[in-house]
């Protein structure tokens, strides 16, 4: 990475309340290098220009810190992580979190496993599978302090994918864009899935005019066993 990109990463992280040391920067540099290398073999990301990756992938991922829920030591699952966003940047900054990356694409899982080995991560597990299936598995169901998702699906659909993994009292952090009208259209999903919206946090990404929101959802009771439903039901008959 060029010096300008490194400075943007460090300054941008600082504006989010994060101090990056040199070893953090080195990890991000390795991440970027491997992202470009593997992206030539598979579709990991359409964003490859250095400064864009810093802003739209690295700093966007780190913006989850603004939720105030990740302080280190939490069990975190990143659902539909893709190329590792936001999970890997969070793990770089908070190596003590226990991180599970859930991804349905086997090729992306292979990339994430290789990346984790290169970065010498401990306390990380990469799972090849689908959220609506693993959310019913005892080893994963209601076992995490925090679930994250950067997917583009509507919030009421994301809730059914994510909430089954979250323990009672834990949180789901949905990374959404500028428009958050859907927050006011998911009352039924919140009631059915035994959760409530605790906070909506506006985040303006450093060095850009991009406005995002973090939707912080708290799990308040044990989830009924019928959830999550099968994918077709989730998609065609959303709560």
UniProtKB/Swiss-Prot annotation:
The UniProt GO MF terms for this protein read:
rRNA (guanine-N7-)-methyltransferase activity
Q: Which keywords does this Swiss-Prot/TrEMBL entry list?
A: Cytoplasm, Methyltransferase, rRNA processing, S-adenosyl-L-methionine, Transferase
Q: Which residues bind S-adenosyl-L-methionine?
A: 80, 85, 103-105, 131-132, 150
One GO cellular component this record assigns the protein to is: cytosol
Q: Which InterPro entries match?
A: rRNA_ssu_MeTfrase_G, SAM-dependent_MTases_sf
Enzyme nomenclature, EC number: 2.1.1.-
Family matches, as Pfam families: GidB
Q: Where in the cell is it found?
A: Cytoplasm
Subcellular location, principal: cytoplasm
State its role: Specifically methylates the N7 position of a guanine in 16S rRNA.
Give the UniProt family note.
Belongs to the methyltransferase superfamily. RNA methyltransferase RsmG family.
Q: What is the protein's given name?
A: Ribosomal RNA small subunit methyltransferase G
Q: Which organism is it from?
A: Caldanaerobacter subterraneus subsp. tengcongensis (strain DSM 15242 / JCM 11007 / NBRC 100824 / MB4)
Q: In the UniProt record, what gene is named as encoding this protein?
A: rsmG
């Amino acid at each position: 990475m060029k010096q300008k990109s490194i400075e943007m990463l460090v300054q941008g992280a600082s504006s989010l309340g994060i101090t990056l040391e040199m070893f953090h920067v080195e990890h991000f540099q390795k991440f970027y290098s491997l992202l470009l290398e593997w992206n030539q073999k598979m579709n990991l990301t359409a964003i490859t220009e250095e400064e864009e990756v810093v802003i739209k992938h690295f700093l966007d991922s780190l913006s989850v810190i603004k939720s105030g829920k990740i302080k280190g030591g939490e069990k975190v699952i990143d659902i539909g992580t893709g190329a590792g966003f936001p999970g890997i940047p969070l793990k770089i900054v908070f190596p003590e979190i226990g991180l599970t990356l859930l991804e349905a694409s086997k090729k992306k899982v292979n990339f994430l496993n290789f990346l984790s080995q290169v970065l010498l991560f401990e306390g990380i597990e990469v799972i090849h599978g689908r959220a609506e299936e693993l959310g019913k598995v005892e080893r994963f169901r209601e076992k995490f302090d925090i679930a994250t998702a950067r997917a583009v699906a509507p919030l009421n659909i994301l809730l059914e994918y994510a909430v089954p993994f979250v323990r009672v009292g834990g949180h789901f952090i949905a990374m959404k864009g500028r428009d958050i009208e859907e927050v006011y259209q998911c009352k039924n999903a919140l009631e059915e899935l035994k959760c409530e919206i605790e906070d909506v946090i506006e985040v303006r990404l450093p060095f850009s005019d991009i406005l995002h929101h973090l939707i912080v959802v708290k799990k308040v009771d044990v989830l009924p066993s019928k959830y999550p439903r099968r994918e077709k039901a989730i998609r065609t008959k959303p709560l």
